[in-house]
C-alpha cells in the first residue's frame, strides 16, 4: 500500500515540476513578446513556476532517502506553495467571474467606468493608455493585430484625408506624435478614450489572469494531493530520520 502511495506522489511531483518548467518559460516568453504597457502576469508565471520547479523535488529526495526529516521540510514548503497558489487562484477566479467582456470589446454595452474598481483601478487604465503613446506601441505591436492595438491605435472616424499610417498595416504615430501634425478631431485621446480601446485593455488584463488560472488551478489541486499523500507516507515512518536508501 505504501508503494502505491509513493508511486502516486512521484507522478504528482513530476507533473508539478513539468508545470513549473512550463510556467517559468511562459513568463520569460511574455517578457519578450508582450508589451510592457499591458504586461500583467509575467512575474506571477515566473514566481509560481520557480516554486513548482524547485520545491517538489524535495519529495523525490525524501522518497529516495526514506527520510522523515526531509518529508517534514517538504510538507512545510508545500504548505507555503499552496498558500501562494491559493492566493493567485483566488485572484484568477475573481477576475474571471467579475469581468465577462464580450469577445469583440467594441460591442460591449457597459462602459469602462462600470468595470474599473479595485481589480483594475482607473489609474491602471490611465497608465496603460499613456504608456501606449509614449512608448510608441502602435508602431511596435500593431502587426500582432490584437484588440488593444486594433481599437487603441486605429485611425478614428472623422479624420478626413489625414491618415495616421504610411501604408496599410504600417502605423506612423511615432512620427506624428513627435511633430504634432495630428488635427484635433484625430487626437490620441480620441482613440485611447473610446469604448473599444478601454474595453480591449481591460480584456487583455483579464485574459492574462484567465490564462494563469489554466495552470494555477490544476497545480493547486496537485499540491494539495501531494500534501495529503506525503503526510500519510510520513506517518508510516517510526524514526525521525530513517535514512536507508531503499524501501522496506
From Swiss-Prot:
Q: Which residues lie on this side of the membrane: Extracellular?
A: 29-44, 91-208
Q: What membrane topology is given? A: Multi-pass membrane protein
Q: Which domain of life is it from?
A: Eukaryota
The keyword Coiled coil is annotated on this UniProt entry: no
Q: Transmembrane stretches, by residue range?
A: 8-28, 45-65, 70-90, 209-229
Gene Ontology biological process terms in this record: auxin-activated signaling pathway
Listed under GO cellular component are: membrane
Cite the InterPro entries for this sequence: TET_plant (IPR044991), Tetraspanin/Peripherin (IPR018499)
Task: List all annotated glycosylation positions.
Answer: 96, 141
| Positions in the Cytoplasmic compartment | 1-7, 66-69, 230-248
**Which keywords describe this protein according to UniProt?**
Glycoprotein, Membrane, Transmembrane, Transmembrane helix
The subcellular location is: Membrane
One Pfam assignment: Tetraspanin
Note whether Chloroplast occurs among the keywords: no
PANTHER family hit by this protein: TETRASPANIN-8-RELATED
Record family assignment:
Belongs to the tetraspanin (TM4SF) family.
Q: What does this protein do?
A: May be involved in the regulation of cell differentiation.
Protein name per UniProt: Tetraspanin-16
Species, as recorded: Arabidopsis thaliana
- Which lineage? Eukaryota, Viridiplantae, Streptophyta, Embryophyta, Tracheophyta
